[in-house]
From Swiss-Prot:
Family stated for the protein in its record: Belongs to the SYG1 (TC 2.A.94) family.
Tissue specificity note: Expressed in root epidermis, leaf hydathodes, trichomes and petioles, stem vascular cylinder, receptacle, stigma apex and pollen grains.
Protein name, UniProt field: Phosphate transporter PHO1 homolog 8
Topology versus the membrane: Multi-pass membrane protein
One example of a Gene Ontology biological process annotation: phosphate ion transport
Species the sequence originates in: Arabidopsis thaliana (Mouse-ear cress)
Function: May transport inorganic phosphate (Pi).
Upregulating conditions: Not induced by Pi deficiency.
Taxonomic lineage of the native organism: Eukaryota, Viridiplantae, Streptophyta, Embryophyta, Tracheophyta
Length: 751
């Protein structure tokens, strides 16, 4: 792989703008090379050089007999100055500029200096932020040590004026024995501790006095904390010295250190990549321009803050030492395994298994079609009854499998265009599923469902199994029960971390607005709005099997008032959840756009209810009302999708898209907008009551649901692309991890 591609591949996606523009500099070098070739073709065999032509006017003849040392010392000169903001600025002067490509060389070094200043400034500002964060972490660790001491000595009464005998050295790092956590983190403190027993007595009350100034942060969002916030009650609580609290504090602080170490690694990689890019581009310049300027320029780079600063390396060593000692039981291998990033390895068995299940799914679909044709099931006497009972039961799997396939395609294109979806969704590092894993699960489920359909039909048509009609009817229920059992299985199989993450987010969607709304919450709720028909299928499962209709092989659900009522409610639940999420964000974030977004979902709720009422009653009044509100909801939703969720149709940008696009072909965005509008209009089909003669009504409803799932899959890609570009614009590459302790002076300062 060429360096240019490797350079881009190793970039932190959210920091792309902060990296040196290697491609731009290569383009300038090509211009220099082109100028030289053009000059050679015109018969220019010798180059005339001028020393400081733009500055002193002194000229000097260039001879190839110059020694390499002369060339090294006189090709360029780099000046370092300090700007008004206190950051270093570098300016390169070319001492010998040839007539051929002179302008391009000046542009090259001007661009290189600007890019290097940008990189150096970004690196230094981030290092300063991390040093400040290290001070905060040091205070958190001091509080943790004091908490441990107090928990180990519960009967000890203490105050700031008393001295107690506590072996605090036993809690410190072996390599840093006799030092406080502040010293370990590199913060200068007064040295009043020695290795003697008396000094321990003097240190213990000082360490324990920290507990006077701290409170526990109740950062874990729950309904109770939401109520406390509404009532303007503080979420800080007095410290209770229990082992359960200690475990929670240690777990939270461990996550803080892991994220802090991740920041350090990213910044170290940032420094290395940019330094390497400068070295590579200067070597190319020397080769093309026949100079020897790389060595001098790299000497300047080596002296700059970007490479000379060792704060990051020191912090990394201190974090490793503290983490291993206090969170890994002094087991360095275990500690470093937790700190270092988890790399997901592509496994051949995943590819093989996915291909196997794809083949099985295709084969079973063909077999199902041949079976239906050979047995003339569509023309059989019980065809209509079968479509009203079995079809809704099995269509559930089709909706879920299609949605998973669309999500797998989303992951593929997110990876291709470097959308950092694991960070956006907040997946635990190393546990995110790739598109291969999702395809494996989707086609595995598809194979299972198709096998169930064929078994059901075969048992229905086979005279030998005709007596087992009840068991035949229970086949789809067995499949649903199996899927639910796997989803909630506590054992570490079938991607447990991803399953539990999904279930947790699903619960937060159901419990809206009692939980703070994060992106995974409203993203999943939006997915559920495209699975209304699947939710109605689940309702049919409960009715068909719960009320015992499967024994008579005839559904009485639609004649039930309870079923009809819940037929409304089930369709509204996803939109109601999104509505409540928008209301909570409007109150918390004071973002007016969330109010307009809530209005969109409120309109959709009314439209869905009217459409459902029209599908049941078939009256003209219902039809007109459904027409009006469905049209408003469709127009409003389409506009919101394109303008707000996707960030397109931005007037100042070229072609009315947006300033930055990840997909290089603009036509993709125009096609996506048109397709979104068309598929949104398909939503109106239930109001239009447009039927195809050779399709059963249940089939038509399923086709409309499938089109909505496809629309949602397209929406997913551009929605996350827009979110990623927002993160890039704000250089947001790290998640915020809540701290366990809150100091009283910090609370006073915040207030």
């Amino acid at each position: 792989m060429k360096f240019g591609k490797e350079y881009v591949a190793q970039m932190i996606p959210e920091w792309q703008q902060a990296y040196m523009d290697y491609t731009c500099l290569k383009t300038i070098l090509r211009e220099i090379k082109t100028s030289q070739k053009r000059s050679e073709s015109q018969g220019v065999l010798k180059r005339k050089l001028s020393g400081r032509r733009n500055f002193s006017g002194l000229t000097k003849r260039y001879s190839r007999t110059f020694s390499s040392r002369d060339l090294e010392n006189h090709d360029i000169m780099v000046h370092a100055t300090t700007g008004d903001d206190g950051f270093e600025k570098y300016e390169t002067t070319i001492l010998k500029v040839s007539e051929v490509g002179r302008e391009s060389e000046l542009v090259f070094f001007k661009t290189l200096d600007l890019e290097f200043d940008k990189v150096n400034r970004f690196y230094r500002s981030n290092v300063e932020e991390l040093v400040k964060e290290a001070v905060v972490l040091n205070r958190q660790m001091d509080a943790l040590i004091a908490y441990r001491i107090k928990l180990d000595q519960p009967s000890t009464s203490w105050s700031c004026s008393e001295t107690v005998s506590v072996d605090i050295n036993a809690l410190d790092s072996k390599e840093q024995k006799g030092k406080t956590l502040a010293e370990e983190m590199g913060i200068k403190v007064e040295e009043n501790v020695s290795n003697g027993g008396d000094s321990t007595k003097e240190t213990a009350p000082e360490a324990l006095s920290v507990l006077d100034r701290i409170r526990l942060n109740k950062n874990q969002e729950n309904p109770l904390s939401t109520i406390r916030n509404v009532l303007k009650l503080s979420n800080k609580e007095d410290i209770k010295f229990t082992k359960e609290n200690l475990k929670k504090i240690e777990e939270r602080l461990k996550n803080v250190f892991i994220e802090f170490y991740r920041k350090l690694r990213h910044l170290k990689n940032y420094s290395f990549l940019n330094t390497l890019a400068i070295s590579k581009i200067m070597k190319k310049y020397d080769k093309i321009a026949l100079r020897n300027a790389a060595k001098l320029y790299m000497e300047m780079v080596d002296k700059s803050y970007l490479t000379s600063s060792d704060e990051i390396n020191k912090l990394m060593l201190r974090v490793e030492s503290i983490f291993v000692e206090h969170f890994a039981g002094s087991n360095r291998s275990k500690g470093m395994n937790l700190l270092r990033p988890k790399v997901t390895k592509e496994k051949h068995r995943i590819t093989f298994s996915t291909g196997f299940f794809v083949g099985c799914t295709v084969s079973l679909v063909i077999a199902l079609g041949l079976f239906i044709h050979a047995r003339n099931i569509m023309g059989a006497v019980g065809h209509k009854l079968y479509m009203e009972t079995m079809f809704p039961l099995y269509s559930l799997f089709a909706f879920v499998v299609l949605h998973m396939i669309m999500y797998a395609s989303n992951i593929y294109f997110w990876k291709r265009y470097r959308v950092n979806y694991p960070f956006i969704f907040g997946f635990k590092e190393g546990t995110e599923l790739g598109y291969g894993h999702v395809l494996l699960l989707s086609f595995g489920l598809g194979t299972l469902a198709l096998c169930a359909v064929l078994v059901n039909m075969d048992m229905e048509m086979d005279p030998n199994t005709n007596d087992y009609k009840t068991i035949t009817e229970l086949v789809p229920l067995f499949v649903v029960a199996l899927v639910i059992a796997i989803s909630v299985c506590p054992f570490n199989i079938f991607y447990r971390s991803s399953r539990f993450f999904f279930l947790m987010v699903l619960f937060r969607c159901i419990a809206a607005p009692l939980y703070k709304v994060n992106l995974p919450d409203f993203f999943l709720a939006d997915q559920l709005t495209s699975q209304v028909q699947a939710l109605r299928s689940l309702e049919f499962y409960i009715c068909y099997y719960g009320w015992g209709d499967f024994k008579q092989r005839q559904s009485t659900c639609k004649s039930s008032d309870v079923y009809s009522t819940f037929y409304f409610i089930v369709a509204v639940i996803p939109y109601w959840s999104r509505f409540l999420q928008c209301v909570r964000r409007l109150i918390e974030e004071k973002d007016v756009s969330q109010g307009f977004n809530a209005l969109k979902y409120l309109l959709t709720i009314v439209a869905v209810c009217l459409r459902t009422a029209f599908s049941i009653n078939r009256g003209n009044d219902w039809k007109i009302a459904a027409w009006v509100f469905s049209g408003l909801a469709t127009f409003y939703g389409t506009y919101w999708d394109i303008v707000y969720d996707w960030g397109l149709l931005h007037r100042p940008s070229k072609s009315w898209l947006r300033e930055k696009l990840l997909v290089p072909h603009k036509s993709v965005y125009y096609v996506a907008m048109v397709v979104n509008v068309v598929l949104r209009l398909a939503w109106l089909q239930t109001v239009l009551d447009f039927n195809i003669s050779f399709l059963h009504r249940e089939t038509m409803v399923a086709l409309i649901a499938i089109l909505e799932i496809i629309r949602r899959g397209i929406w997913n890609f551009f929605r996350l692309e827009n979110e990623h570009l927002n993160n890039v614009g704000k250089f947001r590459a790290f998640k915020s991890v809540p701290l366990p302790f809150n100091y009283d002076e910090e609370e006073d300062r915040d207030s």
